[in-house]
């Protein structure tokens, strides 16, 4: 009987600790994948990894030097044609 009570109390304490930890996070893990794609895009921009007109672009792909990626064809467009 005592062992059962100890196990129940331990389970309740662990559950409470998990809930407290989840509340303390303050949503820092929300949209983690989205943030990582944005970081990757920014990293590629700053390191000069950009594509010329006609190159494939989009999420997790090459960033366009012109800054214009056609969302339908997933290709870089020239500033004058955008």
Swiss-Prot record:
Which residue stretches, if any, does this entry annotate as coiled coil?
none
Q: Which domain of life is it from?
A: Eukaryota
Name the cystine pairs.
50-65, 57-69, 64-76
Q: Any idea which residues bear 4-hydroxyproline here?
A: 53
Q: What is the effect of changing residue 62 to A?
A: No change in affinity to Nav1.2/SCN2A
Signal sequence residues? 1-22
PTM 6'-bromotryptophan: list the residues. 49
The UniProt keyword set, sorted, is: Bromination, Disulfide bond, Hydroxylation, Ion channel impairing toxin, Knottin, Neurotoxin, Secreted, Signal, Toxin, Voltage-gated sodium channel impairing toxin
Recorded GO MF terms: ion channel inhibitor activity; sodium channel regulator activity; toxin activity
A GO term from the CC aspect:
extracellular region
Positions annotated as pro-peptide in this chain are: 23-47
| Outcome following mutation: residue 72 to A/D/R | No change or small decrease in affinity to Nav1.2/SCN2A
Protein modification: Cys-71 is a key residue that tethers to the channel by covalent attachment, leading to nearly irreversible inhibition (k(off) very low). In order to determine the solution structure without dimerization, this residue was mutated to Cys.
Explain what the record says happens when changing residue 74 to D.
13-fold decrease of affinity to Nav1.2/SCN2A
Reported effect of changing residue 79 to D?
Answer: Small decrease in affinity to Nav1.2/SCN2A
Tell me the outcome of changing residue 53 to A: No change in affinity to Nav1.2/SCN2A
Task: Summarize where a protein binds, as residue positions.
Answer: 71
Give the consequence of mutating residue 75 to A: Small decrease in affinity to Nav1.2/SCN2A
Pfam families, A to Z: Conotoxin (PF02950)
Q: Give the protein family.
A: Belongs to the conotoxin O1 superfamily.
Q: What else is known?
A: Negative results: shows a very low affinity to Nav1.5/SCN5A (Kd=207 uM) and does not show activity on rNav1.8/SCN10A.
Function, please?
Mu-conotoxins block voltage-gated sodium channels (Nav). This toxin (GVIIJ(SSG)) blocks Nav1.1/SCN1A (Kd=11 nM), Nav1.2/SCN2A (Kd=11 nM), Nav1.3/SCN3A (Kd=15 nM), Nav1.4/SCN4A (Kd=4.7 nM), Nav1.6/SCN8A (Kd=360 nM) and Nav1.7/SCN9A (Kd=41 nM). It binds the channel at the newly described site 8, which is composed by two surfaces whose one contains a non-disulfide-bonded cysteine (which is free to covalently bind the toxin Cys-71).
Protein name, as recorded: Mu-conotoxin GVIIJ
Organism per entry: Conus geographus (Geography cone)
């Amino acid at each position: 009987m005592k062992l059962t009570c100890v196990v129940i109390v331990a389970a309740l304490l662990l559950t409470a600790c998990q809930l407290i930890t989840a509340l303390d996070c303050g949503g820092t893990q929300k949209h983690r994948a989205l943030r990582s794609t944005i970081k990757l895009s920014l990293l590629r921009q700053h390191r000069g990894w950009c594509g010329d007109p006609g190159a494939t672009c989009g999420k997790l792909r090459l960033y366009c030097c012109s800054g214009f990626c056609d969302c339908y064809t997933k290709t870089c467009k020239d500033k004058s044609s955008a």
